[in-house]
Amino acid sequence: MRPTEEKIQKDPSDLPIYLFKQGNNCEAYRYFGAHLETRAGESGVVFRVWAPHAAAISVVGDFNSWKPGSHPMRKVDGDSVWELFIPGVKEYDVYKYCVTTRGGDLIYKADPYAFHAETRPSNGSKVYDITGFAWHDDAWQTAQKKADVINGPMNIYEMHAGSWKLKDEKVPYNYSELADELIPYIREMGYTHVELLPVMEYPFDGSWGYQVTGYFAPTSRYGTPKDFMAFVDKMHEAGIGVIMDWVPAHFPKDGFGLYNFDGEACYEDPNPKRGEHKEWGTMVFDFGRSEVQSFLISSALYWLEQYHIDGLRVDAVASMLYLDYNRKQGEWEPNKNGGKENLEAVAFLRKLNDTVLGRHPHKCMIAEESTAWPMVTKPASDGGLGFNFKWNMGWMNDMLSYMKTDPLFRAGNHNKVTFSFFYAFSENFVLPISHDEVVHGKGSLINKMPGEYEAKFANLRTFFGYMMAHPGKKLLFMGQEFGQFTEWNEEKQLDWMLLDYDKHTELQNYVKTLNAFYKEHPAFWQIDYSWEGFQWIVPDDSKQSVVAFLRKDANGKQILVVCNFNPVLREGYALGAPVAGTYKEVLNSDDEAFGGSGAVHNKSVRTHKKPLHGFEQSITITLPPMSTLYFEVPTKRTRKAADPAKTAQTVKKTAAKKTAAKTTKTAKAEPVVKEEKPKKTSTRKAKAEAEPAPEKAPAKRGRKPKAEAAAAPEAAPAKRGRKPKAEPAEAAPAAAEKPARKPRAKKAAKTEE
C-alpha cells in the first residue's frame, strides 16, 4: 500500500484532494469553494482553494472590511490546497481570495469554484447554498433516461437569454420570468430543445458569455442560481430540453479570474507557445494537468447534475485539437511525435466524454468542431473523441454560400447542395444555423438571400424545407424563424414588431408547420446517421437546380422531398418513384398560407409504368418556382410469407385430392372430359379474337407518351439522373430488361395519331 493510500484510509477527508491531484475528482465543487457549515455549534463558511505557488492566502470580504491577512488560510495538504473556516459568514456575503505571490505581490482573486457572483462591473464571489431547490421534473428525467438520444427528434432553438425579449428597453427578464415568456412560444413553434449561449459568469457583455470567469456560477445578470434552476425545471415540465454552451477551450485574462491565479500559471499552459490564443486575447487551459482536468470535468458534471441540464455544446473544439490553430510558423511547436495535434487536449476530451456519458448516457455532448478531424462522435475506446453529436460546419458553409448565390448562377454551384452526402453519415451531425452566422457584418439569414423582398422569403422557405429534410439534427438561432432583417445585437431584443407584417408572420407559420411535420414524421429523424434512412432520386439536375430524395423511417415509411432552387415553374417534371400508387403532396413551401404564390398544388399524383432513376415506375409533377415539396410515399403492399411446413402439407393434400378426383372422373364419366377440351379451345380463341380489350389498353398508354413529349425539355435532367448510378445501380439494369411494353406503347401512340 502506498503512503498516500494509507493516509487516506486513516483520514478519508484527504480523499477529495488525492482524487483532485489524480485528475479524477469529478465533483471537486463539493470540496473546493465556499460551503455553509456548522462547526462546534457555530455556523459559518469553510473556504478552500487550490493555489500551488502562493506564499500566503487570506479570505477578504465585507465581513472583515476587505483587510488582507485578517483571516489567513492554512495549507491542508502541506502543498497546494488552502482552507479556512470563518464563523458568522452567511449566504450572499461577498468575498475574494487575497493571494501573496512568491514575489511578494498581493493579488485579489474571485473563487474559481464560486456558485454565485456579483453582477458586472463588480466581480466578487458570493457565498451561496445551492441545495434545497424543489424540483418538479421527475417525469421528464425518467422519460429522458429511456429515450434514444441519437435516433430521436432534436430540433434546437438557439438563443441568448439577455436579448431574446426584454422586460423594458434595457432590463432583461430573470431566468424564471424568461421561462414563463419562452415556454408558450417554444411549444407553439414546436422546438424540442432550447440551447442557451453561455450563462456561466462572464465580465464582458460583448463576449456573449464565451470568456468565462465563473465555471460554477450562472451569470447573475439574470438572477440567482435557484432562478436558473427554476428556468430549467419549468422548461422540463413543459416538455422542452435545455442545452447550454460550455467553454473549456480558453478563458480571459481578467485580473480577478483564473489567469496567473497565484501569480504564476495554474490553469493555463505555462508554455507561451501553447498557453495563449493571441487572436482572441485569451489563455488556453493546461489540459495535461490533473488538477485542471478535475476542475473542468467537475464543471461539466455540475451543470448536468445540479441544474439538470440535458446537454453541453462544447465550444471551439478545433482550437483545442491543433497546436497550430490560428498560429503562424514559429508561434507553435510540435508535439512529442512531431505532429500538430494537441495530444493532451485529445486525451482530455476523451476522458471528459467517457466520464459524462458513462454516468449519463442519455445526455448530449455536442462538439463545435470545424475541421475534418476524424471520429469526433465515435467512442474513445474505438479511437474517437467520444462526443455523441457534432456540428456540421461544412454543410452550413456550403449551403449558405449556395443560397447567397443568384439563382442564375446556381447551376455551377450545384455540388454545394450535394457534397455533404459524401460525409453525411461519417458523424452524428447537427445542422447549425447559429448565432455565428448572423453577426460581424455577415447579415441576418433572410438578408443573405438574393433578390427583392418577395424573393428573399421564397429562397428562405426553400432552404428551410431542404434543411428540415436533410439528415441530421436541427439548430436555428432566434429571430431567423420569422425573418429578422437586422444582425443580432446582444444589447437589443429581437424585432418582434416585424410580426405585424404578413410576410414575417407567414414565414413564422411556415417554420412552425415544418417543425410540426418534422416531429410527427420519424422519417426525418429516426435514421439520421445511415444510408438506410436516405436515398437519392435526382442528385445531379444542376441545369434546373433541382434535387429530389427520399427519407425513410425504421418501419419503411417514406417521404419524397423535391427542391427547386430556381424561380422557374417546372411543369411535367418526371422523377422515379420507389413504390407504385398515389403520391400525396403534404407540404408545399409556395403555399399561400406561407407567403407563397399558391399557384401550384400537385395534390394526388399517380405513378405510371415508365422506369426512371432506377425505379420501375415514375411520377410527373409540377414544381412551383423556388420551392420545396414533400410527398407522402404510398406504403408497399407485401404478401404474408407462407409457412413452408404448412405449404408442403397443403401441396401433398391437394395432390392427393386431385389424384383421387381424376381417378373417379375417369372411371365414372369420360364424356365429360371430352366436352371440356372444346371449351378450353373456344376460350383461347375468344381471347385471341377479342380485339377490343387490347385496343382500350393501348389507348390509355397512348396518352402517357403525349404528356411526356410535351415535357421533353423537363425530362432532360431525368436522363442525367441516370448518370450517378451508384445509388440505383441494381435497379437500373432491371428497368432496362423490360423493353417489351415500350414498343407496344409506341405502336399504340402511332395508332392513335
Report each predicted region and the residues it spans.
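Carbohydrate-interacting/catalytic domains
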Residues: M1-G152, S176-I186, E454-F457, M468-L476, ...
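Short, flexible loop/turn elements at secondary-structure junctions
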Residues: A51-H53, D77, G88, H160-K165, ...
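N-terminal cationic-hydrophobic initiation segments that often serve targeting/anchoring roles
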Residues: I186, V232, L304, N353-L357, ...
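Intrinsically disordered, polybasic Lys/Arg-rich low-complexity tracts
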Residues: K636-E753
